[in-house]
Structures are given as C-alpha cells and as structure tokens.
Amino acid sequence: MLICSTFHEMSATWLDSALEAVTLDEVVEKVKERAGFRPGYGDKAREVVDAYAKAFPGRKPAEIWALATSTRQSVVALADQKSKQPAPVYVAWFGWQPPLFDGRMRAFHCVDICFWFANTDLMLSHTGGGARPRRLSEKMSRSLLQFMKNGDPNGGGLPAWPRYTPANGETMVLDDVSEVRNDPDREARKALPPL
C-alpha cells in the first residue's frame, strides 16, 4: 500500500485571505469547536496547537491550524495497521506549495493527485504549470509506476524510500527537494485526541 496526504489538507486561507492574519490564540478558539471534518479538540485545543507550533517552528498560525486539523493522524493509524500484514506500506506526505493566490493555497487536499498522474500541466489552477511542478511530478509518477509494477516505489527518481514501520514512521516528504523523514510530526500527534 502507498498512502499519501498533504500538509495543509483542510486549509481555510485559500478561500478567505483575511485568515492569513489569524493568531495562534484564534487558532486555539477555532479548533475547540471544529477540527477539519472532526469534532473540535475542546479543552485540549491549546495543547494541540502548542504541540504543532513546537513541531513546526517558523510556520504561520494559519499553517499550524491546517497541520493540526489534517488527516495525517488517520493516515498514520492506517499505515500502522496495514504494516502488520505481509505486504509493504509506503507513506508520503505532500508539502509542495503552488505559487498561486499569494501562496494561500499551500499543499491543499488532493493537490498531489495531478502529480502522481503526470498532469501538472493540465491542472494550472492547482499547480500554476511549468517546469517546477513538472520536475516533482515526473519523479512521483515514475515512482507510482514502479510501485504498481513491483510493489516498491524505488527507482522512480525520488530518494531511497524505505518501507514504513510503526517504530520509525518512515515518511517520504514530497517537495521540490524530497526527503525521507522519520515520523516528522509524531510528537505533535501525541497531543491529538484518539481517533
């Protein structure tokens, strides 16, 4: 299994530019009641937001909001369960951001799909088109083909991609310069309520 999610799955800022100015305190209030498609974090909201701010220093509060309400917790839970079976699991986390809407779109929900299928030049509203997204797309689509042929994405142009294990949380972070990182948000996810 190859599983991918994006950094900013449920980012609200691309629809409302005023939300770019949100503060961390305002993010806490927003995630008390609602966290993406899930119920809010209630009394844990401050702990969750602080954990993500610590794990991702230098990120704007709007980005912390998106990271803390993304689907990554579910992706990791699925990978943990699937890794108990004999077939390998590979996990990716898409962080590439299009140069559109003054950067507000970020790595939004499903933007990675056109990269996997070599369609970045057809999805100008998602990527802006051109050489920059195409370079990553070529590597991602070749890696997906390798995975479809062999059950292993290696050999497609991305860095060496180890199988996912719950102990290390090996995750291919997809961006202009892709790299494998061991469970890059593990400490932050510990603050989240259980699924």
Predicted segments with their positions:
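Short, solvent-exposed polar/charged micro-motifs at secondary-structure junctions
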Residues: L100-R104, G169-T171, N182-P184
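Tryptophan-rich aromatic "cage" segments
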Residues: V177-L195
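Tryptophan-centered motif/residue detector
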Residues: W96, L144, L158-W161, L192
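Non-catalytic, well-ordered alpha-helical segments in soluble enzyme domains
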Residues: P133-G156
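A structural signal for short secondary-structure junctions
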Residues: F108, E138, Y164-P166
